[in-house]
Regions:
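Catalytic-domain carbohydrate-binding cleft regions of carbohydrate-active enzymes
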Residues: 3-201, 206-207
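Accessory, solvent-exposed terminal regions and/or long lumenal/extracellular loops of proteins
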Residues: 201-320, 324
Length: 324
């Protein structure tokens, strides 16, 4: 059950307090050994608090914030009654609620290499996708009571906005440095900060030493191959990541039909090592490009930053890349 269970929080109502409670509910379920969790974006029942539904800008804001949170759960899923939920029912491109939703949908798709590889760690090693902070920072007592922040995988700290506000305070765990996903600003851990949160921004902080693979912008998961992934290196510590791939839509991985590519970052030497590919499966890419980005205040920021530090060809053999 642990490897495949997908739970949801039930037919909850559209309410800011309910949105806040979704975070701790997800983390509690993850701690019981069920790694995949989701909720109805915007709440299932909206008529009580928002009788006008998608005609009400107040519902738009709650829905957008809920979608931002859902982007970093086991399944990103919109579902409900009383009012339509399709993105085009909120307006057109150029309207803030439409644009903020499109931004999160694109981000979810672009993070699929990271999410899919993390899911393999769940299957093969029993890891979790939504991680309570004390699981990874047991020596930091400040995280013991934090129920509104979490790690998504081992690298991305998520601090959802759960009220009608344009800023929120959050705590960055001690023992590492953190890099703002959107701006590249570096913060020392072990402190509370205040982050501005315009309606299209959810606070995201990446742990120093992380390697995050970023895929193409797509309309569905398998629309484009992963033959030119961006690899974002967040400096400040050593780190590693294993990219997992398989045939996408069957159980052949249970028969060993998959591949892994281990990547390691040596921060002192500023060296990325992409190790030999392990495994094989039908349709596996024999060669590909990696666009490697050393994240700083300009490069590797947010969703659409396509700049890169160096471009390499990879054919399954070990390569070392020295970065400035």
């Amino acid at each position: 059950m642990y490897k495949r269970q997908q739970a949801w929080s039930g037919d909850v109502v559209s309410d800011w307090g309910v949105l806040r409670n979704q975070i701790s509910a997800a983390l509690n379920l993850s701690l019981t050994g069920i790694p995949y969790w989701n909720s109805d974006i915007g709440g299932f029942f909206s008529a009580n608090k928002f009788p006008e539904g998608v005609k009400d800008p107040a519902f738009h804001e709650l829905y957008v914030r809920w979608m931002q949170f859902a982007t970093f759960t086991g399944m990103m899923r919109s579902h409900g009654t009383n009012t339509p939920r399709e993105i085009f029912m909120f307006g057109e491109r150029g309207y803030w609620a439409f644009d903020a939703q499109e931004k999160m949908i694109n981000l979810r798709y672009r993070l699929l290499p990271y999410i899919y590889s993390t899911s393999w760690k769940i299957t093969s090693e029993g890891e979790s996708l939504m991680r309570a902070l004390f699981s990874d920072f047991p020596e930091d007592k400040e995280v013991l009571d934090l129920g509104d922040e979490y790690l998504f995988g081992k690298s991305i700290l998520v601090a959802p906005v759960t009220s009608e506000t344009r800023s929120r305070s959050l705590y960055l765990p001690a023992g590492t440095r953190w890099i703002d996903f959107w701006t590249g600003e570096v913060q020392d851990g072990g402190c509370e900060i205040t982050r501005e949160t315009p309606v299209d921004i959810i606070p995201l902080y990446v742990k120093a030493g992380s390697i995050i693979p970023v895929g193409p912008t797509v309309q569905f998961a398998t629309e484009k191959s992963w033959d030119d992934l961006q690899l974002r290196i967040y400096p400040g510590a050593n780190g590693e990541f294993t990219l997992y791939e398989d045939e996408d839509d069957n159980y052949n991985y249970e028969k060993g039909k998959y591949s892994t590519i281990r990547m390691t970052w040596n921060d002192k030497e500023r060296k990325l090592t992409i190790h030999p590919r392990q495994g094989n499966y039908n349709g596996m890419l024999q060669e590909r490009k990696f666009h490697i980005v050393l994240v700083n205040g300009q490069d590797g920021l947010g969703l659409d930053n396509e700049s890169y530090t160096v471009n390499v060809e990879y054919q399954g053999k070990k390569i070392n890349i020295k970065l400035p």
